[in-house]
Amino acid sequence: MILRLSLFVSACFMIPIQASAEQYFVKNQLEYFAAEKKVEAGDVITLANGVWNDFEITFSGAGTKEQPITLTAEDPGKVILSGQSNLRIGGKYMVVSGLVFKDGFSPTGEIVSFRRSSTDLASHSRVTNVVIDRFSKPDRFEADLWVGMYGKHNRFDHNHVAGKSNKGVTFAVRLTTPESQQNFHRIDHNYFGPRQTLGSNGGETLRIGTSHFADTNSNTTVENNYFDRTDGEVEIISSKSGKNILRGNVFFESSGTLTLRHGDGNLVEKNVFIGNGKDHTGGIRVINRDQIVRDNYMEGLRGDGFASALTIMNGVPNSPANRYVEVENATIENNSVVDSARITFGAGADAERSVACLLYTSPSPRDS
């Protein structure tokens, strides 16, 4: 089978600049922070090529849809943020592109944060063509996030994120305040590269929400991403909120599943799972109400139980939202499972998870 993947074409986009817009070319941190204090809609800050060591970037302002404020590299890929470095974005209509994080780690709990502070969240902002390469804490048991997404209407696209070796979710959509809920974020066309097995919870590659916000809608779209051997834990993507769209993603030899852990009304469609016979590779795990799972392709998966090619969980009677809500009113249709070890219905059945789902099948077109 040949998969034609067009995920990593560089995003070429034009940013219109008014005659009054300022171009700041900066060669050190003092010059950067002086420019960052002055930027207005349409302005561009360009970092000079080279290694920027121990650089904690804050980037906030008031751009517009037509005139975003941009932080970029002199040449994409040639601005290296090393040592103890990170990036915090606030304001609105801000764009960051072309930076590389490697040979270091964040001194805080996040490398890239879509908030400058608890009161300055990013909105309508974008991080694109950025690399985070093995930028892990030295102590593998010290947790952090590599990307924390807050605010609303933000986009993370065409980035390379690989090699996390310490505890903590690689990418988390945070719903901690109303200002970050029903956010309509987009996470698309990214490469999520190998992550070693953590051996405990907290090793997801992507988590949308947490159990504290299980009844909250996130309205986040995750599409056209490539998950390459992301083996952190059994949940590669953990959707813990409602009304999310997970579409057109590829999971290549990744141990674990796309899991609808909490939240109702999610859509999972047109994803491809290729296991190539690797142990513990799985597909989709379904929990909660009103989920739609359609037109997905699963081949060569060897996981079973919670990591089967398709897993339908048993529920807890009258379950609170943060436990195991029974699968109800789910639509699971037009999915293909090829050369895979297991499809599991009633997974996790025990004295607590005692509610099985009722299955209804539609007639095959050949039977009509």
Feature map (PLM): residue ranges:
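Glycine- and acidic/polar-rich repeat regions and solenoidal domains
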Residues: 56-57, 83-90, 102-125, 132-362, ...
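Beta-solenoid repeat scaffold
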Residues: 39-80, 87-98, 120-125
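Residues at the C-termini of beta-strands that transition into short coil/loop
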Residues: 30, 72-75, 85, 105
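Cleavable N-terminal signal peptides
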Residues: 8-9, 19
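Sec-dependent signal peptide recognition
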Residues: 2-8
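Right-handed parallel beta-helix/beta-solenoid
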Residues: 19-34, 49-51, 74-75
